[in-house]
A protein has these predicted regions:
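N-terminal non-catalytic cap/leader segment that marks the start of a structured domain
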Residues: 1-114
Length: 117
């Protein structure tokens, strides 16, 4: 199962790749949650989905729901922007002088161990 963070206009949603097409998983989650009121699965990013204690359970339930009610065609999206898999990273790690030519450009010898900052 491959997930994407996607956007159409200003609306973000989770996309689910299905045979070279993309299902609007966020929309499927909203429909599922509306019908089965015990679940509040209103997620617009992969990070939000992963905040669940058991995201695999959620994905399985919704995938079964989509199949059972033959909803794929109504959930496919055609034209959208693919966003970063992590929309709000908690930290960013960079690697300094990570190749010989770059180290020499900056006037340094290549490091023996990676320089992270």
């Amino acid at each position: 199962m491959k997930l994407l963070n996607c956007q159409i206009d200003n609306e973000r949603f989770i996309g689910l790749l299905d045979n070279n097409r993309t299902i609007n998983l966020s929309k499927a989650l909203k429909v599922y949650s509306t019908i089965y009121r015990g679940e509040d699965w209103f997620f617009n990013s992969i990070e939000d989905l992963l905040s669940l204690d058991n995201p695999e359970f959620c994905l399985k339930k919704v995938a079964d729901f989509i199949e059972r009610y033959n909803l794929k065609e109504s959930l496919y999206v055609e034209s959208f922007k693919t966003l970063s898999p992590i929309i709000r990273p908690s930290k960013i790690i960079a690697l300094g002088r990570n190749y010989t030519e770059h180290a020499r450009e900056t006037g340094y010898n290549p490091p023996e161990e990676p320089i992270f900052f």
